[in-house]
């Protein structure tokens, strides 16, 4: 009797210790959320608008956007929710600072991280492992672009919404009990899992969340498979369809009405093999985030798949794990299908969703390993600390490099705001074609009038010279007014020139690497460029055919279409780079 009593006492003490450890892990998690947000905001305090998001910013600063344009395809995606966030922040805080936009974006990331922590716990992962892995996800160096490019809300917002929807769907099947480990969760870590049927009463919030997800970007459409698979395992095919059919139907309607141009998008040109390769690269790079080389990522992915197969065979695999894993595959596959040039699956804002969706399986697999090896808790915490520190250090370096690039871009736009005041700049010119390629000089003047871009009192001479040339060179549908002597084609590299009627010449490639053409403007003038085949025309300043430099503009010209390359400053020499196709050049 005394032995039995002693055992009960020991068991009670161990149970209380386990509960204390779980509570401590939860407190540490909430502390990391509270600390990470201001830290992330501070690291990105000097970032600025870049790439496609300028199109949205110009819309809400009076660039001719109509209210219903929020439903138009952005690139090839339905991004109404993200556009509305930009417009709401712009209406409240203006666009002179990037920080308000970044604050909203990082808040979404922090919420997504907390929901991911909930998913890891729901799957039966050890609380300390879940807390450590999510802390690393909070400062995800491999996903720096998703954190510091606000337009990556098209990835972070769908992830948060779909994880929330999946948790609701999974919770409904557990009798609606909240907090702590549920009976099914306790079995998730060690034994067979009971799969109760999903109740219908929580279908409405799942439907609303999935609707918002598909309105937030392409990843949201791909992630519909996650609640669908949870519903399939919890309530069968009918329940799965009922959860995602409204969102899928609304997306199909939008595709038919507003997104018809997407149906003509070229997509990937290399067929199914390119899609499979893109998916494989994305998954292995996601797994390699914490391990280093891609080879280790491939090995880890194979081990994870084998572990999932063993658990599934034993009916001990929580439904959220295969659902999220299939969601990761779907995200990379849809991304590959939507990119005309194939793209790079290891781009950081693509990896963000892949890492987040593979983390539930990785967390439970690591939990199984730790329990099997009986690793001391101190060793586990030390290892997780190294992972978090490594991820945070990578993020700090990437944020610093990003800030440098953004500030360089901003300085060029501010210089254009000052130099364009004399009225000689071409409206269609592009002062900063690398990160600000969507901003024309006319846009700069509009932003200056609205005090979004305030011209500096003094300019660096080198910056002034560079911007002065750029704002006087443009590719447009109209010829520059007052054009003088016709520009002369002075040389070609990588191609051949042949005469054509009306004093024109045809420039054609002599290899698969494209060609460059040098054009000299003795006076202000315009060169007529007509595409013989689909052509991406890139215009450079002060370059040579062998080494063009200082890109000024680029435009895609369709077959039979034509553009004018205008130069307003006498003595300008331009280099036209044509990666593919042939062009007809006329004065």
Can you describe what each PLM-predicted range is?
Residues 6, 17, 23-69, 73-76, ...:
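Intrinsically disordered, polar/acidic, low-complexity terminal segments
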Residues 80, 98, 102, 132-159:
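Aromatic- and kink-enriched transmembrane "portal" helix at the membrane-lumen/periplasm boundary
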Residues 116, 120-140, 160, 179, ...:
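Transmembrane-helix signature of polytopic, membrane-embedded enzymes
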Residues 133, 154-176, 357-361:
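Specific aromatic-rich, kink-prone transmembrane helix
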Residues 147, 155, 343-369:
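Hydrophobic/aromatic-rich transmembrane helices and adjacent perimembrane loops
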Residues 162-203:
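Membrane-interface transmembrane helices that cradle and orient dolichyl/undecaprenyl
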Residues 192, 221-252:
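Perimembrane helix-loop-helix junctions
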Residues 202-217, 224-228:
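Membrane-interface alpha helices of multi-pass inner-membrane proteins
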